[in-house]
């Protein structure tokens, strides 16, 4: 949130001679300073001022309004001065670690210290009613984004040492951090609100709002208007009598604003059809009775719309369109001080042209006298020309731009004409009727200031050097300005006076030329005190008001007449009432239907003046119960509301309800108590691709009527027709009337989608295709014809696109045809495309939210050597769109970018593959594989996953067709040193691997192995078996088969002997659609799979469908035969449908598979290929995709009508089992003793109770709590590098291997070395005590003992750099060691949770939704171009589409929430990553 703060311009000096004042001129004193100055400020209601020297950080104080200055002793190296807004005697001077506070305007200072420097953003939080209660925020640690820091507090004004409030916070503030908030109420005096890290995650999507009344000994998460807590909190601010917080859901830039007037009841702010986006709104200076927000109209233009809330801060209506903004978020908007209802704004006149082509803005100034409800031109006396003034986006002085508390006196620099010109072409204008009429005061631009309640106006030339200061005693009328001549020329930097504008003394900060060259800095003190006598009663107008009726009487503004006692403009006197602000009196007016009312939320204005009406907006829903049955009319609001804060008396017809005909509104559909279905037919032979554009439920959590808009699906048929539905497939319409060859949903922003044609034209929507939001742009070239990925997206900058086009490719077979990459930073808009690199195969943005600190502009590309298509590839990098480039590797086969790692495969001269990994995009280290691992050439890699601070890598051992298998090896925390996890793992010809991680739980994975590898090496057919791990690959076991099948019959083998009789399930290599997963991120602990019980995996024809609800420890057979499945309402519904044969029904379970019910969706059978729902599995709707004879069909099945889902589920984190949920803890099946321990702790998850008749709907944080940490056991460790696991589970040195001296790393530049150990703790484990004594200790290298002690003595700061190894040292990339408080050697890890101590149990990135199967394939075997493409094309019917795997972007939209945790791009490594148009 950006705020208009008074701009404090730099200023400085040491002492210089003063100029004696003449009787007819003000007293002038000049003080010179050696250095440039900053932070020139007054203490309110006094003549005491402070200023700071920039170069040395010294602070100077004046007790006489700048006449004389003295340096404050013992205060130096100051970074910032901050005054209390609520105590005009208090201020804090912030140094690097030592700080000072005063309670007597700087006469005396007390010091206090913090461990680290203050935050540059908001270092101090003042309490509005207790000046001794203060928060101090330390600088945030941003090395591993996102930025988190520590906050201290004091309750005695730092008389005692400040105490730590909270460690990992984004921001904190007092509840009573604004004068108007809880004003006069005797409660919440010690209440503090903080936005902190997530419960078990450092990722910004998990940030929480916490409230505490006892300085965070205890804290609670407030429930928002939906009755639930909300994660993803990004910002917070106090605005008059409101506190506003903003939250951002994952995978979306859209924000939700929540407001409160007491921190107990929170409201979700509603903006009608408009979206609020991150970094795209400014909370303006608001009123005591409403919040005013300026919202950007587009991410790419500095222009907005201004909205004003009702008195509760919940419903916002649009007041001003096309407001002018700048890139810093400042808005040309100012309320005229002390005058109610008067607002000055600048608007963009040529907004259409500016929005479309970015041509220069043409600005107009407008003024409102009714708080922004209506606006009029600024007029100059005696002229017809409009006046336009420079405003907040072009500041030239500190404080307010136009006004001060001096009643009705307003000044500004601008020009007359059609539009606002340059500042230097402007003149100074003045108004003494609050902007109603203006006249030119002085020609040329001037800085200006108000004194003595407007009796004195001072101005100084602002376009260069001058030796004059101008002043007026007659409200700035044109001929009333007099000159003060200086003996030297100055360049004015700042002109200021007391904030209340009651003083006759002014200060000017300026610079002047020095003898011998250069400039010196001066503060000039001006005192007008003795120039005029004090005013008498006859000199005042006792009832001055802003506007007057035609009869000369004051007019009504905001429901009353606001009257001031003001000096007459021509009175020859000074008021001299210093430090007393002018106070108005009020006379109430009767309510007027035109003047005192505006359109209510959900209604749009139509017409002007007396003809103005408020008509229901398109997005407005009917009131509950309206137009049901045969009703012809319904009662509704009038559409009008009294303007918030309006004080008029009486009532009018505007406040009465009206009757509206039902014909004006869409009839409510009849409510059903049954499951419903809608079947839609399409022309075509295949569904080419389909994607869900899911709007995060949090964004609309308390607007259930809009739920239908949340479930948008886009789909493409092989007829090249793109379709779209917003209600999960009940009604479909064509997305665009054009031939579409590909759909690209944005990988990181669910609202964005792109429809590609075979030409340069690209259709796109930034709002999921809603509200006629589909537009088009011209790409720089046609799409490439090399079957490469055409579009790439930036994880953080949603409008940054990479386009992979083809040049000279219009003719088929043209030898000059080649690929070219382009960048747009404005979502493809006109003239925004810049060429990057030609002859490329792939270009990718490298930035990620966590763990990789690189420039947002950094891009990696694979480019053909010497710019020849088909030549060997090289990996190149740039952070300026390839104006300069760096070659990272030559002979590159492929590279993959994942959450924490970038992995690059290169081919050596002998044909072997080498793998290098990096964490930061610049320092690479070659992967060290288990010694003696390869007796043959390294032929192919598949990068499987990197979500648990380690890379899982499949290395192919046998690459022969139909005989492929390999080993899964697992890396250390920097991706360089690997140990064996599981051997003989099945792979197919395309590089896909039978490996899948469970969604929602870390460390659980399933794989299929080839049981007869020796026979397979001799050409025999594979015999496959399934294995499961519950400790992140450290140990694998067969799947426990159920005792009986679904017909209650025993199996033919002994299920107690798992080695000979276990469950085997079909894996990733056999799926038509890789988006189909065993598990769901929101149905925690549940998996479904197709397979059989026996000694090995058999065919699909012999398979049954199985289910587990305890993360794979036990399984049950639920149906004979092969079924496809989906989870709904976070596991509350499980729907299955027969796959591969004609059917007219589905089965569903509402009790985790205990009982299955049949629902018939059609009168005749259709062939179903897939069943899908929204990626988060939170919906009550499903879609079946299939064929009906020669036509394609999509069937919506809607469970929302069932009585089981009428009520919203209740969840209470404080009493988790009291409502509709139980607590469930995952277990390790082989754990000795404490079975509830998994990864060294007992985790508790929310799971809906069986039989609870309610809908969960809005996504909940399933992780409830880490109940406790467990004592370490063997299960918390895996074998270290150079060691292998023996059948008994112990780790021993690989036979015949000579271990290097661990101290050798010291000779290569390292500062520390470790004892060798056969074990390493699994990075996920948080176990404590009984740590295995084999764990190696850390030692200092010779010469670094002192640094070692100093570093390892650090404590308290959440993250610190512990050691950086050169990348050759021990194969390290440069990694960080996170240490626990007791100095015990902890795990070495990087990434999102690396910022927390092990003792914090910061292990969970919930839910784990990394790409589970194949993520990246590298192969050295040449592929015949097109063979894979043909293979994939045959599978398009499943929605997998012709695209090989844009990974999350493709399949996050269909199955499982791959977006949730790891921004794994998951490219296929190898020439399989092709794209065709």
Swiss-Prot record:
Cellular component terms per the entry's GO annotation: cytosol; Golgi apparatus; membrane
Signal peptide limits: 1-21
Biological processes, Gene Ontology terms: Golgi to endosome transport; Golgi to vacuole transport; protein targeting to vacuole
Keywords for the protein's UniProt record, in alphabetical order: Glycoprotein, Golgi apparatus, Membrane, Protein transport, Receptor, Repeat, Signal, Transmembrane, Transmembrane helix, Transport
Location of the protein in the cell: Golgi apparatus, trans-Golgi network membrane; Prevacuolar compartment membrane
Glycosylation sites: 288, 974, 1018, 1269
Region entry Disordered, spans: 645-672, 1019-1050
Residue ranges that the UniProt entry lists as topological domain Cytoplasmic: 1378-1405
Family recorded in the similarity comment: Belongs to the VPS10-related sortilin family.
Function recorded in the entry: Functions as a sorting receptor in the Golgi compartment required for the intracellular sorting and delivery of soluble vacuolar proteins, like carboxypeptidase Y (CPY) and proteinase A. Executes multiple rounds of sorting by cycling between the late Golgi and a prevacuolar endosome-like compartment.
Name of the molecule in the record: Vacuolar protein sorting/targeting protein 10
Organism: Leptosphaeria maculans (strain JN3 / isolate v23.1.3 / race Av1-4-5-6-7-8)
Lineage: Eukaryota, Fungi, Dikarya, Ascomycota, Pezizomycotina
């Amino acid at each position: 949130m950006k705020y208009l703060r008074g701009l404090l311009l730099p200023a400085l000096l040491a002492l210089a001679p003063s100029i004696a004042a003449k009787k007819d001129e003000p007293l002038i004193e000049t003080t010179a300073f050696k250095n440039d100055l900053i932070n020139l400020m007054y203490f309110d209601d006094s003549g005491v001022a402070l200023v700071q020297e920039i170069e040395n950080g010294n602070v100077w104080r004046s007790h006489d309004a700048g006449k004389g200055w003295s340096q404050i002793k013992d205060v130096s190296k100051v970074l910032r001065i901050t005054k209390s807004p609520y105590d005009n005697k208090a201020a804090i001077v912030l140094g690097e670690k030592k700080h000072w506070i005063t309670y007597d305007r700087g006469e005396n200072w007390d010091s206090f210290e913090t461990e680290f420097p203050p935050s540059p953003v908001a270092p101090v939080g003042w309490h509005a009613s207790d000046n001794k209660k203060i928060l101090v925020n330390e600088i945030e640690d941003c090395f591993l984004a996102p930025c988190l820091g520590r906050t201290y507090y004091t309750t005695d004004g730092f008389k005692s040492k400040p105490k730590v409030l909270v460690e990992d916070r984004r921001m904190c503030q007092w509840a009573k951090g604004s004068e108007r908030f809880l004003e006069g109420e005797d409660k919440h005096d010690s209440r503090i609100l903080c936005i902190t890290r997530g419960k078990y995650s450092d990722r910004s999507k998990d940030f929480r709002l916490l409230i505490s009344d006892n300085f965070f000994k205890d804290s609670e998460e407030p429930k928002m208007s939906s009755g639930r807590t909300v994660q993803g909190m990004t910002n917070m601010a106090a605005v008059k009598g409101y506190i506003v917080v903003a939250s951002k859901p994952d995978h979306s830039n859209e924000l939700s604003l929540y407001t409160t007037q007491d921190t107990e009841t929170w409201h979700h702010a509603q903006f009608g059809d408009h979206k609020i986006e991150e970094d795209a709104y400014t909370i303006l200076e608001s009123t005591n009775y409403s919040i005013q927000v300026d919202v950007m109209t587009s991410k790419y233009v500095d222009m907005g719309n201004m909205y004003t809330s009702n008195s509760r801060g919940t419903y916002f209506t649009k007041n001003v369109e096309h407001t002018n903004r700048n890139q810093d978020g400042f808005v040309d908007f100012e309320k005229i001080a002390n005058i109610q209802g008067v607002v000055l704004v600048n608007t963009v006149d040529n907004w259409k042209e500016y929005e479309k082509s970015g041509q220069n803005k043409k600005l107009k100034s407008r003024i409102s006298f009714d708080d922004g409800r209506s606006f009029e031109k600024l007029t100059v006396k005696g002229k017809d020309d409009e006046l336009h003034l420079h405003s907040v986006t072009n500041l030239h002085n500190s404080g307010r731009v136009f006004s001060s508390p001096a009643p009705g006196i307003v000044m500004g620099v601008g020009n007359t004409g059609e539009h606002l010109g340059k500042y230097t072409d402007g003149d100074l204008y003045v108004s003494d009727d609050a902007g109603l009429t203006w006249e030119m005061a002085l020609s040329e631009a001037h800085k200006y200031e108000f004194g003595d309640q407007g009796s004195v106006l001072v101005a100084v030339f602002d376009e260069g050097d001058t030796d004059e200061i101008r002043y007026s005693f007659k409200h700035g009328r044109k001929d009333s300005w007099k000159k003060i001549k200086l003996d030297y020329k100055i360049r004015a930097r700042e002109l200021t006076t007391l904030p209340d504008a009651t003083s006759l003394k002014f200060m000017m900060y300026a610079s002047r030329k020095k003898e011998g060259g250069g400039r010196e800095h001066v503060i000039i003190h001006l005192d007008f005190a003795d120039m005029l006598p004090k005013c008498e009663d006859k000199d005042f107008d006792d009832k001055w008001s802003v506007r007057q009726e035609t009869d000369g009487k004051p007019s009504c503004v905001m429901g009353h007449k606001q009257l001031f006692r003001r000096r007459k403009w021509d009175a020859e006197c000074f008021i001299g009432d210093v430090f007393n602000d002018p106070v108005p009196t009020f006379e109430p007016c009767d309510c007027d239907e035109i003047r005192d009312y505006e359109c209510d939320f959900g209604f749009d204005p139509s017409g002007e003046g007396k003809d103005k009406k408020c008509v229901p907006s398109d997005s407005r829903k009917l009131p509950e119960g309206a137009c049901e049955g045969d009703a012809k009319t319904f009662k509704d609001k009038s559409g009008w509301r009294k303007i918030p804060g309006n004080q008029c008396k009486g009532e009018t017809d505007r406040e009465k309800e009206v009757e509206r005909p039902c014909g004006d509104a869409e009839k409510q559909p009849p409510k059903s108590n049954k499951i419903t279905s809608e079947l839609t037919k399409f022309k075509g032979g295949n569904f080419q691709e389909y994607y869900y554009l899911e709007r995060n439920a949090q964004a609309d959590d308390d607007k259930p009527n809009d739920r239908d808009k949340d479930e948008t699906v886009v789909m493409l048929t092989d007829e090249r027709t793109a379709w779209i539905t917003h209600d999960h497939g009940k009604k479909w319409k064509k997305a665009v009337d054009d031939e579409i060859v590909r759909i690209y949903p944005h990988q990181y922003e669910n609202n964005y989608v792109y429809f590609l044609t075979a030409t340069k034209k690209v259709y796109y929507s930034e709002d999921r295709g809603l509200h006629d939001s589909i537009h088009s742009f011209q790409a720089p070239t046609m799409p490439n014809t090399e079957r490469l990925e055409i579009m790439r997206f930036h994880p953080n900058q949603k409008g940054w696109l990479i386009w992979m086009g083809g040049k000279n490719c219009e003719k088929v077979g043209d030898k000059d045809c080649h690929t070219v990459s382009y960048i747009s930073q404005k979502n493809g808009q006109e003239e925004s495309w810049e060429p990057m690199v030609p002859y490329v195969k792939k270009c990718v943005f490298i930035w990620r939210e966590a763990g990789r600190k690189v420039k947002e502009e950094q891009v990696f590309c694979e480019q053909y050597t010497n710019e020849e298509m088909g030549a060997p590839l090289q990996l190149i990098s740039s952070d300026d769109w390839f104006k300069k480039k760096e070659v990272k590797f030559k002979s590159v086969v492929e590279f993959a970018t994942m959450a924490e790692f970038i992995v690059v495969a290169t081919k050596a001269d002998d044909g072997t593959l080498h793998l290098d990994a990096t964490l930061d995009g610049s320092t690479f280290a070659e992967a060290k594989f288990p010694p003696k691992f390869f007796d043959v050439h390294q032929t192919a890699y598949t990068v499987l996953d990197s979500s648990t601070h380690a890379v899982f890598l499949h290395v192919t051992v046998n690459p022969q067709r139909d005989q492929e298998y390999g080993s899964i090896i697992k890396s250390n925390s920097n991706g360089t040193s690997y140990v064996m996890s599981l051997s003989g793992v099945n792979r197919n010809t395309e590089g896909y691997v039978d490996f899948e991680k469970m969604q929602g739980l870390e460390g659980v994975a399933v794989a299929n192995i080839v049981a007869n590898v020796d026979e397979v090496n001799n050409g025999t057919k594979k015999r496959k078996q399934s294995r499961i791990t519950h400790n992140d690959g450290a140990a694998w076991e067969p799947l426990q088969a159920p005792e009986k099948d679904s017909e209650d019959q025993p199996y033919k083998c002994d299920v107690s002997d798992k080695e000979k009789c276990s469950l085997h399930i079909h894996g990733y290599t056999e799926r038509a659609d890789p988006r189909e997963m065993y598990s769901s991120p929101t149905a925690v602990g549940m998996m479904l799979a197709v397979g059989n019980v026996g000694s090995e995996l058999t065919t699909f024809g012999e398979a049954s469908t199985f289910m587990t609800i305890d993360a794979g420890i036990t399984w049950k057979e639920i149906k004979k035969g092969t079924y496809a499945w989906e989870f709904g309402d976070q596991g509350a519904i499980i729907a299955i449908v027969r796959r591969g044969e004609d059917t007219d029904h589905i089965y569903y379970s509402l009790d985790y598979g205990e009982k299955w019910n049949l629902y018939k969706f059609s009168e005749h059978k259709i062939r179903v290929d897939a069943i899908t729902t929204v990626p988060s599995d939170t919906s009550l709707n499903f879609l079946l995709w299939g064929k009906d004879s020669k036509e394609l069909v999509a069937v919506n099945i809607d469970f929302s009508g069932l009585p089981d889902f009428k009520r919203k589920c209740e969840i209470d984190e404080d009493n988790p089992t009291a409502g509709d949920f139980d607590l469930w803890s995952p277990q390790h099946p082989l754990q000795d003793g404490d079975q509830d321990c998994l990864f060294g702790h007992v985790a508790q998850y929310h799971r809906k109770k069986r039989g609870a008749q309610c809908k969960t709907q809005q996504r909940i944080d399933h992780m409830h709590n880490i109940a406790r940490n467990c004592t370490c056991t063997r299960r918390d460790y895996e074998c270290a590098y150079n060691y292998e696991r023996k059948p008994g589970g112990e780790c021993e040195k690989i036979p015949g291997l000579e271990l290097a001296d661990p101290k050798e790393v010291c000779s290569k530049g390292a500062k520390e070395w470790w004892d060798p150990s056969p074990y390493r703790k699994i990075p996920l484990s948080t176990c404590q005590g009984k740590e295995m004594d084999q764990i190696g200790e850390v030692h200092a290298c010779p010469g670094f003992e002192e640094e070692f002690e100093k570093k390892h003595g650090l404590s308290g700061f959440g993250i610190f750099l512990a050691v950086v190894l050169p990348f050759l040292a021990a194969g390290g990339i440069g990694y960080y060691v996170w240490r626990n408080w007791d100095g015990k050697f902890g795990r070495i890890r990087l990434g999102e949770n690396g910022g927390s101590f092990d003792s914090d149990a910061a292990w969970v990135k919930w839910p784990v939704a990394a790409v589970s199967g194949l993520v990246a394939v590298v192969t050295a075997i040449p592929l015949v171009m097109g063979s894979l493409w043909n293979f994939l094309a045959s599978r398009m019917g499943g929605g997998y589409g012709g695209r090989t795997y844009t990974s999350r972007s493709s399949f996050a939209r269909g199955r499982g929430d791959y977006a949730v945790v790891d921004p794994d791009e998951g490219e296929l490594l190898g020439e399989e990553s092709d794209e065709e148009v």
